[in-house]
């Protein structure tokens, strides 16, 4: 809900779409309190890439019959719901940085730590960190090129695609890196939930 609230406060977003699995359609019940431009599509897949591809397919197909729907040239922001600490300021910064870009881009952070390669629990190599970034979301690309990039890997079960930027890279594009926030971390493990709660309390 924190993610939806942040997205809902960005006036330039014409539509906010939540893609859920058909089996989880009950998880996000219809809520009249949400803005009218919020909608839910129960077409999620087994992976993030498949869910994004299915969602884009549904939106573009709808746009074929509705000129006010999503068109291939429209910008799409894809956000991972596990990054529930995203703020409207970070979303706006990404939009400002990418709106006039030929490709689009993503929020990311320069890698601050030394990066090690492990083999059987021991360090085998230390990698230079100067050119390494940690990818975040949202990631912003035009609907048509992103859909085409994902479609090109659909028959391979989206092998090698870990985010939208990686799909665009495989299609020959170089996404723009936009500095994000360390607070926009992915809530995955139990300690992450406690940390996220602390951050949310500090914002009140």
Predicted regions and their residues:
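Glycine-rich beta-alpha junction loops
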Residues: 22, 110-113, 182, 191
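Hydrophobic helical membrane-anchoring modules
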Residues: 184-204
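Hydrophobic packing residues within well-ordered alpha-helices of enzyme cores
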Residues: 27-29, 94, 196
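Acidic metal-phosphate-binding loop of nucleotide-sugar-dependent transferases
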Residues: 48, 81-85
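Conserved core of the sugar-phosphate nucleotidyltransferase
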Residues: 85-178
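Short aromatic/hydrophobic "clamp" motif used to bind/position activated sugar donors
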Residues: 76
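Residue-level signal for inorganic ion chemistry
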Residues: 55, 79-80, 110, 142, ...
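Conserved N-terminal catalytic core of the sugar/cofactor nucleotidyltransferase
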Residues: 1-73, 156
